[in-house]
Amino acid sequence: QHTLSVTRLCEYYCKAYPLLKKDLLITAAICHDIGKTKEISLFPENDYTDDGQFLGHIVIGVEMVGEKIRQIPGFPAVLANELKHCILAHHGEYEFGSPKKPAIMEAVALNFADNTDAKLQTFTEIMENTTETGWLGFNRLFDSNLKGTRME
């Protein structure tokens, strides 16, 4: 669900900001978390793999995408680097596990879409798990005291 939501946000960004390379951004959105398929083991184990512990999903994902790119004859080197950069930079900041900060417009857009979906989905889950309105208390992810609101 997260990857689909990120991709939809990126589609919107492409309409709102025509300078974005749509093919690059949509491909990056689809591939940005592909490394999680090797970072975490399957159910019922559902725990970090050795590769997941050592490398993390971002590095694993760049390696997976790089392997596929090498199988495509004549794939443009600049485009390959741009796609890999988007994946490497999708967490946006070093302190959030990003090996690189976004350096191209598509990487910025992907970071915003990923962050927006993660935070709004988390807030949605908080709201779905409470019947309270008013102040809900401090939340570390948001670094803020959250307030529950409902449609009247």
Can you describe what each PLM-predicted range is?
Residues Y12-N129:
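Divalent metal-dependent catalytic cores for phosphoryl transfer on phosphate-bearing substrates
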Residues D117, W135-F138, L146:
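C-terminal membrane module of polytopic membrane proteins
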Residues Q1-R8, I34:
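All-alpha helical catalytic cores of prenyl diphosphate-utilizing isoprenoid enzymes
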Residues N111, E128, G137-R140, M151-E152:
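N-terminal intrinsically disordered, cationic/polar leader segments
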Residues T131-T133:
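C-terminal functional modules
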